[in-house]
């Protein structure tokens, strides 16, 4: 399938199956997506191949997705952010981001592939607020 967009997407989740599945859904829909299980690896790669969109789990053991998003914005200011989580503790992390001027929206997880694609396509059209998917 040929790419329908030049959008470079990084998908980060500490669970390989989730990162790979989301990247596959995006690739099957014509997007260029790279899966990572290590947020530090995603940051290193971003220095070489600046992503247009970061899709990341919020709750990861070595670095939260919110911290990853904030660091990604420092490395790649034009990168848009899409976060997801199944953890209630997400609210505390979001508060930190809001205090730094980022206004995240909260949606329920699991996200249906159609919903994921709608959000990604929406990110193609807007440079504003990041999205958080949570349970």
Annotate each language-model stretch with its function.
Residues 60:
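Receiver (REC) domain active-site loop signature in two-component systems and cognate sites
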Residues 67, 80, 88-108, 114-118, ...:
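Alpha4 helix (beta4-alpha4-beta5 surface) of REC/receiver domains from two-component response regulators
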Residues 37-38, 64-68:
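Acidic catalytic/metal-coordinating carboxylates
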Residues 1-8, 112-135:
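Non-catalytic signal-transmission and effector/linker regions of two-component phosphorelay proteins
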Residues 5-17, 22-26, 54:
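Conserved acidic segment of CheY-like receiver
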Residues 35-53:
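Acidic, metal-coordinating helix/loop segments flanking the phosphotransfer/catalytic sites
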């Amino acid at each position: 399938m040929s790419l329908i967009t030049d959008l470079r997407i990084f998908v980060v989740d500490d669970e390989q199956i989730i990162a790979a599945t989301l990247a596959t859904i995006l690739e099957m829909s014509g997007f260029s997506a790279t899966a990572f299980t290590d947020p530090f690896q995603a940051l290193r790669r971003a220095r070489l191949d600046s992503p247009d969109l970061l899709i990341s789990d919020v709750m990861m053991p070595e670095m939260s997705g919110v911290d990853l998003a904030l660091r990604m914005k420092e490395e790649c200011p034009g990168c848009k952010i899409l976060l997801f989580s199944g953890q209630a503790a997400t609210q505390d992390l979001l508060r930190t981001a809001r205090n730094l001027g980022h206004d995240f929206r909260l949606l329920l997880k699991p996200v249906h592939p159609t919903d994921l694609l709608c959000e990604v396509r929406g990110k193609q059209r807007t440079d504003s607020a990041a999205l958080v998917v949570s349970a």
